[in-house]
A protein has these predicted regions:
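Hydrophobic h-region of N-terminal signal peptides that target proteins for export
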Residues: 12-21
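Sec-dependent signal peptide recognition
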Residues: 2-10
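N-terminal periplasmic accessory domains that precede
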Residues: 64-75
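Short strand-turn segments of transmembrane beta-barrel domains in outer membranes
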Residues: 54-57, 79-89
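Outer-membrane beta-barrel porins/channels
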Residues: 22-50, 59, 86, 93-218
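A short, polar/charged loop/turn motif at coil->beta-strand junctions and beta-hairpin connectors
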Residues: 46, 75-78
């Protein structure tokens, strides 16, 4: 009986190990597919904000603040313009701009946008690791419109509707996303309570076609 139980246990372990081994050797080119999109929206657009760990939801600094909290727009009385460029390794660049303006009374409007782009990259595959001779482009971009208003001298709210798109090697995907924020000044020195919800929107999937090749693993 003990021998039978041991045999069953060993067989079960072998089956589990075989199933796990298949996950250790995924099909080449398919690793970590579909994990996340539009991750460029996590890139900071202000040197000051990045230096503070991007804990700037309550910081009414300049026009770039609407990227972190749309409600800040109602705290900027004058017309503000912010422009930045970030140069990453491998010739990757991120350009950003934002502008805010007081419409009338306690109503404010702003625009912002960013584009992550790179030089054409040589296409490589499992069969041609040194390159196929073809080149492809990659680009992420967004453009947003922000509206904010002062409800009282201490409380304001704001929202941003933005269109986000990605193009990579002939594949395209896009979506509309929403940012919302609130700003409340307590009246005690610089103590503020703020909240911000960023990049809330629909599910996104790429458009286009692709060719799937499975290598012989034997």
């Amino acid at each position: 009986m003990n021998i039978l139980m041991k045999s069953i246990a060993i067989s079960a372990l072998l089956i589990i190990s075989s199933a796990s081994a298949q996950n250790l050797f995924p099909i080449l080119g398919g690793q970590r597919a579909g994990t996340s999109v539009f991750t460029f929206l996590n890139i900071g657009v202000s040197a000051r904000a990045v230096g503070m760990g991007e804990s700037v939801v309550a910081l009414n600094q300049d026009a770039s603040s609407i990227f972190y909290n749309p409600a800040i727009i109602a705290q900027l009385e004058n017309t503000e313009v912010s422009v930045s460029q970030i140069q990453w390794p491998a010739e990757i660049n991120y350009d950003y701009f934002s502008i805010t303006h007081r419409l009338f009374g306690r109503n404010y409007i702003g625009f912002n946008g960013g584009i992550l782009h790179m030089e054409p990259m040589l296409e490589t595959t499992e069969y041609h690791p040194e390159g196929t001779g073809n080149y492809f482009r990659f680009q992420d971009r967004f453009f947003g419109v922000t509206y904010g208003a002062k409800m009282t001298d201490r409380f304001s709210f704001g929202m941003t509707i933005k269109h986000v798109a990605e193009d990579m090697a002939g594949h395209h995907m896009s979506a509309f996303l929403l940012d919302m924020g609130t700003f409340y000044w307590t009246g005690y020195r610089s103590l503020r309570f703020c909240a911000s919800l960023s990049n809330f929107g629909q599910q996104v999937s790429p458009e286009g076609t692709y060719e799937k090749r499975i290598l012989d693993q034997n």
